[in-house]
Amino acid sequence: MPERLDQHALVEAITTFLAGRDAQTIDEIRTALARDIAAAGQGAFTALVERLATDGGDWSYYPPDPLARHIHHVLADRILQPGSTSLGVEHVTAAAHRPVVIFSNHLSYSDANCLEVLLYRVGSDLAGRLTAIAGPKVYSSLKRRFSSLCFGTIKTPQSSSLSSEDAVMSPREVARAARQSIEVAHQRLQAGDALLVFAEGTRSRSFGLQPMLAGATRYLDMPDALILPVGITGTEALFPVGGETLHSVETIARFGRPVEARVLRERAGDDRRLIMDTIGVAIAAVLPPDFKGAYGNGQVNLDDARRLHHLLFED
């Protein structure tokens, strides 16, 4: 995207996501976007452009932008195939109007976008209060910042074992930024947000789940918070790792049973590794076999996690 945008330039920049689509479809999308951006008014457009220029400058919370969110829904209606849906909606309903931490597998930069759209389509209040924990890469370009604006985000440093972009920061600076981000996350939970955490810490290149990071238990300190596991499929093809364009695919979000964070922590004796492995097993339980990865049925050293999953997450 160009650094300075007028309404026409924004529409043209957005359609670069759609390279490879037929000309008629792109023209229809271009017309719909131009109409809706104009209808939103100059104030909404100016606010969006300012956000594109400034978001990500601090380890802080960035709210959703209404116009960006609407644009994403317009695109989703034309990109997500008809079979795209949410399964286990009764579990989403059980988490309504509660502080909740959603733990998901991580396949692409479009995961949070698809989850927001699918929650919106089933009328869940979680869509409107979704706030994703986001690493620095999410803010590294205008295109990625635009994609982040249809939900709230909290910028956080990546785990030191995975980080590349934060290499210029000292360990002390990373720790300070992480503490600040966690404090902000707790504030957003108290304000009623639904936190979305990709606890693998990075996107999976094999599509299979990677080991959950034990440090993600820091988001579970709120006494009455729920844990809601979800497994996403399809986004690995929608916006592949290394790709720059969106592809028309079927995406499915499969939700598991929500559990009180307090109960899991008590049952696990506050063992951070066991807590996160149990959540990993809960995510794997709703995913197809090829996506279970480190938490598949054949993996060893997960007996305690499987026992807790059976006790707490299974109906």
Residue ranges and their predicted role:
Residues V117-S124, R218-D224:
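Short, surface-exposed basic-aromatic patches at helix termini and helix-loop junctions that form
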Residues I133-G135, T156-Q158, M222, V230:
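Generic beta-sheet signal
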Residues H97-P99, A127-R129, G192, D224-I227:
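A general structural motif
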Residues E90, H106-S108, A134-Y139, G201, ...:
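Short, flexible loop/turn elements at secondary-structure junctions
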Residues H70, F151-D166, P258:
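Short, basic/glycine-rich phosphate-binding loops at helix/coil junctions
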Residues P2-I29, E165-D315:
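Non-catalytic C-terminal accessory region of glycerolipid acyltransferases
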Residues M1-V101, H106-R121, A127-G128, V138-R145, ...:
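Membrane-anchoring hydrophobic helices of lipid-metabolizing enzymes
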